[in-house]
Amino acid sequence: MGLEEKLPGGVLLTTVEKLANWSRRSSLWPATFGLACCAIEMMSTGAGRYDLSRFGMEVFRASPRQADLMIVAGRVSQKMAPVLRQIYDQMPEPKWVLSMGVCASSGGMFNNYAIVQGVDHIVPVDMYLPGCPPRPEMLMDAIVKLHEKILAGSVSGKVEHTKVGSAPYPKPIEVATAWSGLPAGAVDTRTLSVNDRKRFSLPEDAPVPAGRGAVEPVLDERRPAAIAPPSVFGRGKRVPVDAKPTDESRAGGPGPSTETLTDD
């Protein structure tokens, strides 16, 4: 006499892991995290034509504490990298990450100092989706494959993701130096502010690199004159840019001691 003869009809036997993973797969709530044009395809997937709600994913949450899946749709800039990591840390376990499009997966066409060359430098990625941008059918296929991975997972402890490098995420200047082909220790001034850029600028007597040609310096005396506000230098007065107002000029007098040009 088998076990099925002792149990009443309608009883289904399964394991706790299968039941828990089935529940996770059937109620996967994505976080609202569209970064670029791939987000348009992600929104189309959630609309009525493709109906992502068939997979229990129609609820896009604006709060990371209520989301299970982060769909990184679009390229990740250097300034967005710490924000993305913070949102990922705020998501409760278990959580998954889907990299949508080549820009999110590897930087895509934006191979420069401003874009992170792959979101897996910041967060662990469970599913990579190619395309520029991927169609809604491709996103749904990636989600189905992620469902299969969730069903095969374990409920004990944390969910195993693809590992991120053990080193902390580098600063933008360090990343730009590594990606731009500059020698070690060099600084890519494109990532600096205007004030910091002056500290790394070449001196006036520095030799010009070969192939670039000499650049004629702009002398102070060649600067064009600017029309000063009437409240400072008097109405209709034209003075050099470097000229400073005097007490006499404030009262509408002849102006600063330097040469003053009139409208005549």
Swiss-Prot record:
Top enzyme category: translocase
Main subcellular location: membrane
Cofactor binding note: Binds 1 [4Fe-4S] cluster.
Record's GO cellular component terms: plasma membrane; respiratory chain complex I
Keyword Isomerase: no
Chain intervals for the UniProt region annotation (Disordered): 201-264
PROSITE patterns reported for this sequence: COMPLEX1_20K (PS01150)
Keywords: 4Fe-4S, Cell membrane, Iron, Iron-sulfur, Membrane, Metal-binding, NAD, Quinone, Translocase, Transport
Oligomer status and interactors: NDH-1 is composed of 14 different subunits. Subunits NuoB, C, D, E, F, and G constitute the peripheral sector of the complex.
Family: Belongs to the complex I 20 kDa subunit family.
Purpose: NDH-1 shuttles electrons from NADH, via FMN and iron-sulfur (Fe-S) centers, to quinones in the respiratory chain. The immediate electron acceptor for the enzyme in this species is believed to be a menaquinone. Couples the redox reaction to proton translocation (for every two electrons transferred, four hydrogen ions are translocated across the cytoplasmic membrane), and thus conserves the redox energy in a proton gradient.
Name of the protein: NADH-quinone oxidoreductase subunit B
